[in-house]
Amino acid sequence: MTFRHCVAVDLGASSGRVMLARYDSKHRTLTLREIHRFVNCLQKTDGFDTWDIDSLEKDIRLGLKKVCNEGILIDSIGIDTWGVDYVLLDKQGQRVGLPVSYRDNRTTGIMPQALVQIGKSEIYRRSGIQFLPFNTIYQLRALTKQQPELTAQVAHALLMPDYFSYRLTGEMNWEYTNATTTQLVNINTDDWDDTLLAWTGAKKSWFGRPSHPGNVIGDWICPQGNRIPVVAVASHDTASAVIASPLANKHSAYLSSGTWSLMGFESKKPYTTDEALAANITNEGGAEGRYRVLKNIMGLWLLQRVLKERRITDLPVLIAQTEALPACRFLINPNDDRFINPDDMRAEIQAACRETDQPVPVSDAELARCIFDSLALLYADILHELANLRGEKFTQLHIVGGGCQNALLNQLCANACGIRVMAGPVEASTLGNIGIQLMTLDELNNVDDFRQVVSANYDLTTYIPNPDSEIARHVAQFQPKRQTKELCA
């Protein structure tokens, strides 16, 4: 067969898309077409920040039906989403309550309990995963302690992409790359860790053994009656994005830039040393047994909230205004946990500047400048941390995802990090999702083979660092931990 048609369902924390890929195996050309885009946002339910899971499923099905109604024969479907959140099911496979978002405050104070009762080094030794207060391990503990009546109804817990695959196929699956984000998977066995799971109060019977990307979960029956395989892709969206990052060699780092920024490198081994623990480095699962050694950064969430609060719709105009302002007048630590979900992001940023005796950003452009400069400096700090961890400097940084369209931030990143930046592709998560599907269909050999396809089909933009830039001069002065409460604290 010359042509393959694969559908990627790519769900982010603010929007979702159903994308159709067309792959020409003879010429190795790959094109994407957006079929359906929809909003994903939090809602308040019984005092919790929850996801409208039924609306998301409705939009997924609508997108799939749109493809089928075009008369296109779909070869496979794959689903990727954000990590850590989950859906609870009862014995009949029916949903128990609505899934609570990781941005809900129910986990406040939970992580410190684990550090005392299990021990920080012991948790890290078992999981290799960074300490974030909203990790699934702490969400489950909050669930079982705060909602025992709801907990008593639970027979299964599925992570978000696995839930949607289940709804399409009727088959349950626990995909490995996303499972590792829970901080509940043992890094040595690739299975759920009994000690960590027991601490949450959840039952091990709620979960099946994690499966690696590339297996067929089951079939979705389209309106025309065709059975279409649903593939377990690298279902954590960052895992998919990394697959599509055209990393040149072992000296290339990546930055998946979106609501969250995730900076790291690929490795065949995990890093679980005391130094890695001190730096709060995570070792998330990747395709083909690779590890994604990385750190989470709050990312463009801060800007997204400011845009929403200020009702700004013309981002290019705002960026142009921002670029005209002097650099580094207002600096914050984007990873301060005060920015996870404040009532007023603008006021929170202003308060952080005021508390550190800096000028206070007032205009929208000043707020954006504060965010961009602070992110770029934090990127530089973390890239240096990662280089020290592995004992080798990086020579190139690949920025992928929606944030790679921000030319100003890309250049600031290059200047601060002092290395060449390659930006693109934008649709990295979708492409990585498609890549695993094509491998499962025996159209491609492996991840490296797929990256060659990506490089041949998608143009990258190069940013050369300017060592004389204002932000480059601020790198040594930047103290990202000067605010009081880091995400991992």
UniProtKB/Swiss-Prot annotation:
A single cellular component GO annotation: cytosol
Gene3D superfamilies on file: 3.30.420.40
Sites where the protein binds ATP: 13-17, 259, 304, 402
Key word ATP-binding present: yes
GO molecular function terms noted in the UniProt entry: ATP binding; glycerol kinase activity; rhamnulokinase activity
Active-site residue list: 237 (proton acceptor)
Pathway involvement of the protein, from the record: Carbohydrate degradation; L-rhamnose degradation; glycerone phosphate from L-rhamnose: step 2/3
Catalyses which reaction(s): L-rhamnulose + ATP = L-rhamnulose 1-phosphate + ADP + H(+)
Family according to the record: Belongs to the rhamnulokinase family.
Name of the protein in its database record: Rhamnulokinase
Origin species: Salmonella typhi
